Amino acid sequence: MRKKIVLTGGGTAGHVMVNVALIPKLKEQGWDIVYIGSHEGIEREIIGRIDGVPYYSVSTGKLRRYFDWKNFKDPFNVLKGVWQAYRLIQKEKPDIVFSKGGFVSVPVILGAWLNGVPSVIHESDLTPGLANKIAMPFATKICLTFPETKQHVNTDKAVYVGAVVREELKHGSAEQGRKLCQFDGQKPVLLAMGGSLGSKKINDALRASLPVLLSEFDIVHICGKGNVDTSLVGQKGYKQFEYVNEELPDLLALSDIVVSRAGANAIFELLALRKPMLLIPLSKAASRGDQILNARSFEKAGYAEVLMEEEVTNESLPAAIHRLYENKDRYKKNMEKSGSSDPLQTLLALIQNTAR
């Protein structure tokens, strides 16, 4: 009899990509897969491109750490989502639920617990996010990406697994990436990306620095939806994308160095690909500070250069990029020492062993 798994997670691409990595492997092992996400989150778009994975949506509320009148309404949306998730899980009868986190995951984990279905939570960041903190007491197992996270998760449910990286990222073609961007191959390539939602600060500083940077690099700029600067379309050596999906492996293969936010999934993918990186973590004013901890951990290990968001200027950004490129061989050498275990297989085995 075929086993069934419910996957959940959303809000940003980082809360979906581990699920995307799991789906082909789960299919190979004969699992039936169902996805529960939010009505309008980015997960709906990403999972909608994958054949054979039915998508259901539930109500949810954002878990804010600041005052907003929606804070009074959203708990009722979460309760509604718990009821919807409970009914969906009751109907689908999965053997296990796997959560990548994000606010949509809370009702789904609670719905699984109410149905007596085991669940596994995956925590990417060094310290747990608010949604995962709420869901952890109701989960069967908690998978960790950083070994240091055990200090912040006071439970024997926690298991260090490591970072799960999408297999297709390892098989990109630099030549295909070069054709896509129409670069001539005469300069090293800088890839800049500000996360699935984009980053105005990074976008603005990078564009202001183009006269300096284009003398040294060809630049691929993944700027976020609605953030393409039409005045720069056609600029030689500068290619903008709002968001990429199938093209990403080729663009990564093409790139010599990368400027990125410090979301855990993204930086571990860059580590697996041995890409020297300049990390610009989200500031504490705009987040809970998890990206700062992620970035500092990579800086300490010698994998990355770090530039704090409040330090980003039209002068500091190109200087940091130049410094990264000058030291790229040292960063690559440090990355080679990071090991080559297979967290994806470890996670698949844990899911198999935890399922009822």
UniProtKB/Swiss-Prot annotation:
Main location as per UniProt: membrane
Reactions the enzyme catalyzes: di-trans,octa-cis-undecaprenyl diphospho-N-acetyl-alpha-D-muramoyl-L-alanyl-D-glutamyl-meso-2,6-diaminopimeloyl-D-alanyl-D-alanine + UDP-N-acetyl-alpha-D-glucosamine = di-trans,octa-cis-undecaprenyl diphospho-[N-acetyl-alpha-D-glucosaminyl-(1->4)]-N-acetyl-alpha-D-muramoyl-L-alanyl-D-glutamyl-meso-2,6-diaminopimeloyl-D-alanyl-D-alanine + UDP + H(+)
GO cellular component, one term: plasma membrane
InterPro entries: GlcNAc_MurG, Glyco_trans_28_C, GlycoTrans_28_N
Top-tier EC class: transferase
Record-linked HAMAP family: MurG
Family according to the record: Belongs to the glycosyltransferase 28 family. MurG subfamily.
Protein name as annotated: UDP-N-acetylglucosamine--N-acetylmuramyl-(pentapeptide) pyrophosphoryl-undecaprenol N-acetylglucosamine transferase
